């Protein structure tokens, strides 16, 4: 959408009007940084009960910056669905991982994402917002990207009814937080003389210790 609709509206293959700009670029860079915030690749284990995949070094530092980045992505690229595939779908695995399923975030994320995608394709009107701003269900919402709450006057190549302010703010937040997290990881890896990808960085954190206690580590 950044290329096809830079500073103007563009109709995606899903029939959603997108408004491209620097917010897409910032979020794209944040996504690349987020990849490098994943540490401890060689330390992923099965849980002792055999029900979970445990990644002890994927602690709240990564989980939070991932959530911020992914919400910005959905807000930019799936604006009429961002409450569901953004906020709600991100909170589900995060709450579980922070409270009772420590170390199991990535498996929770995969499972909830799969369930949501299957549900949304079977019941698409659950999340649909129509061009006039109306919805089948009251909880479906249209974002402030559409300035007057509708898609009135929108056409390919124009900027009528566009307000990218919120998209710019969340994308900038995603970029800043992921940059801070990566800088912290690099500094910690230098200090501990540890390869952050073959080794583990957050072994001194309580979250790591709680997660590792659930895993079969040989």
Give the ranges of each region predicted by the language model.
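Generic multipass alpha-helical transmembrane bundles of integral membrane proteins
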Residues: 1-103
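C-terminal transmembrane-bundle signature of multipass membrane proteins
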Residues: 85-218
